[in-house]
């Protein structure tokens, strides 16, 4: 291809807090997907915990569908934006300057402990209160999906304004647009895609370079900045608090990342191998940024200084069937032969598959069964 445009989107980040692996603790976007795609809610009482404006949309979706109990826990103080005003108009309870420090329950979440936080959100400054709920929606911001651009040789660069890695300088004829380039608003994504697509079409001699039509989108744009908060504090230290899962696929906790730093594993690549952070089939799509932030904090560095690991193919797990094709028959698994294989064939052998090796099983004469031959 003369030009490739990547529009791979972004992943919503979960917030890290104690017991955050209980069933019905979900991403805010996942709760919205249940509501908007299937018209169902995963529970009756919702608590939304967020450090950004975007998660308010989940509360709006919930309220619009069942008009039931919703509480928004916003880690930011004095938030001024349209989504806050809309939430107040819908009589949604908002608790600013607080965060979930621990979830309670055995087989599923039944309540959360909520405590007031300092301006940075990294310290608790008061007593915790318990809020009963059966669904928790969390949002810690968005991470640009830089995986495919990384596989072209582009090194991800940390952008502190959007609190995400985004593609650096391209080394091939490739451009990233929309959310994977750090534009997380829907309108910005579409405008970016149209603009870059038209520009590349003109450069390659196909079109005039001007968009054929404009798309008018009315949406609640995020107005208040996302707070730089990845791991919510607890009354106890990371090593003593209930488990705060960062990579839920491989059970990597905030405490294990901090322990890795204490043990002297300062390189992000070493920490990845010490803890298995991002080693799962998702290649750290939800966990890497949170993990890098916790590591940076433990080392007293910035996320930009800590950096991130690169991403290997494939972007998503690939089935054996897609690789092998339709007519596999005996080609699915390679056959391995011993030096005496031809002699065995000359002596009417029946083979036994031992791994990939063809081993002689027994040597029947004409018409003999295995029992008769043996």
Identify the meaning behind each predicted range:
Residues 1-339:
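Residues forming the flavin
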Residues 333-374:
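N- or domain-start disorder-to-order transition segments that initiate the globular core
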């Amino acid at each position: 291809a003369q030009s490739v445009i990547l529009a791979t989107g972004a992943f919503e980040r979960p917030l890290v807090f104690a017991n955050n692996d209980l069933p019905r603790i979900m991403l805010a976007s996942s709760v919205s997907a249940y509501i908007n795609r299937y018209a169902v809610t995963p529970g009756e009482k919702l608590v939304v915990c967020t450090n950004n404006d975007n998660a308010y949309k989940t509360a709006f979706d919930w309220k619009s569908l069942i008009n039931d109990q919703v509480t928004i826990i916003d880690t930011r103080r004095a938030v001024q934006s349209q989504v806050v005003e809309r939430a107040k108009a819908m009589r949604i309870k908002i608790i600013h300057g607080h965060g979930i420090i621990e979830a309670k329950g055995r087989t599923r979440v039944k309540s959360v402990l909520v405590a007031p936080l300092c301006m940075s959100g990294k310290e608790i400054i008061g007593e915790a209160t318990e809020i009963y709920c059966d669904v928790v929606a969390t949002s810690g911001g968005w991470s640009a999906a830089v995986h495919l651009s990384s596989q072209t040789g582009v090194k991800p660069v940390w952008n502190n304004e959007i609190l995400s890695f985004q593609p650096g300088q391209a080394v091939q004829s490739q451009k990233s647009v929309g959310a994977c380039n750090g534009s997380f608003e829907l309108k910005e994504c579409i405008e970016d895609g149209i603009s870059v697509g038209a520009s590349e079409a003109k450069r390659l001699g196909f079109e005039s370079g001007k968009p054929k039509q404009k798309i008018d989108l009315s949406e609640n744009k995020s107005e208040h900045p996302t707070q730089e908060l990845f791991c919510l504090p607890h009354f106890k230290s990371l090593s003593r608090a209930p488990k705060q899962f960062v990579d839920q696929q491989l059970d990597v906790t905030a405490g294990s990342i901090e322990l890795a730093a204490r043990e002297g594993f300062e390189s992000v690549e070493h920490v990845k191998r010490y803890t298995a952070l991002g080693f799962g089939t998702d290649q750290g799509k939800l966990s890497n940024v949170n993990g890098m932030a916790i590591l940076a904090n433990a080392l007293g560095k910035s996320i930009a200084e800590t950096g991130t690991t690169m991403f290997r193919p494939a972007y998503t797990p690939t089935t054996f069937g897609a690789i092998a094709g339709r007519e596999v028959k005996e080609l699915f698994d390679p056959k391995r032969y011993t030096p005496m294989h031809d002699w065995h064939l000359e002596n009417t052998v029946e083979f036994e598959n031992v791994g990939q090796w063809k081993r002689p099983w027994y040597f029947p004469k004409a018409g003999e069964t295995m029992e008769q031959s043996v």
